[in-house]
Amino acid sequence: MCIRDRDASNVVNRLKAAAFPVPKTLDSFDVAASSIQPKVFDYLSSLEWVRAQHNLAIIGPAGTGKSHTLIGLGTAAIHAGHKVRYFTAADLIETLYRGLADNTVGKIIESLLRVDLIILDELGFAPLDDTGTQLLFRLVAGAYERRSLAIGSHWPFEQWGRFLPEQTTAVSILDRLLHHLSLIHI
C-alpha cells in the first residue's frame, strides 16, 4: 500500500471514529452569511488552537451554524492528522453514566483523552443532575491543557447555572474551559 493510500485510509478511519452525525466541511460553511468575522474563521480553520491545546466555545441560538462549524472544524482537524471525537452533551453524559454503572468511567475518560479534539455539541440543551455535572467535570479537568475541547451551546456562560445545578463544580468546569478559550458568539 502506498503512503497516499494509507493516509486516505487513516482519514476514513478517523472520520468513522469521530462519530459525526452528518458530514460537514468548512468549505460548505457560508462565512459571509454568518456573524463570524473572516479573520476569526481563518484562525479557527488554521487549527492552531488545536495544536496549542486550547478550547473553543461557540455560543448562539438555534440555526446559526454552531454544529456545522464544529463538525467542519473537526473534519478539517482529521484531514490535518488529528484524532477527533464528537458527542452531543446528552450522548456524552449517557456514555459516562453507563461507565459509572459498570465501573468503566475512568477507562472511558482515558480513551477520550487519547484524541486531540473533543467536540461537545448542544451543551445545555437539557439540564444535568449533580452526578452528570461531576462526570462532565472529570472529562474537562482531564483535558485541561492536554487536549482541546470545542463546545457548542445556546447559553452564554453566565447562564450555565440553568443546566449545571451544582455551582462549585460548574465554576470549576468554567474555570478550566475559559483559561485557554476562543469564544465565538454566533
Residue ranges and their predicted role:
Residues 4-21:
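Interdomain "pre-motor" coupling segment immediately N-terminal to P-loop NTPase/helicase cores
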Residues 46-53:
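Phosphate-binding P-loop
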Residues 54-67:
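Walker A/P-loop nucleotide-binding motif
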Residues 1-5, 184-186:
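Conserved small/polar residues in nucleotide/adenosyl-binding loops
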Residues 75-87:
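Post-Walker A helix-loop "phosphate-sensing" segment adjacent to the P-loop in P-loop NTPases
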Residues 26-44:
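N-terminal pre-Walker A segment at the start of P-loop NTPase domains
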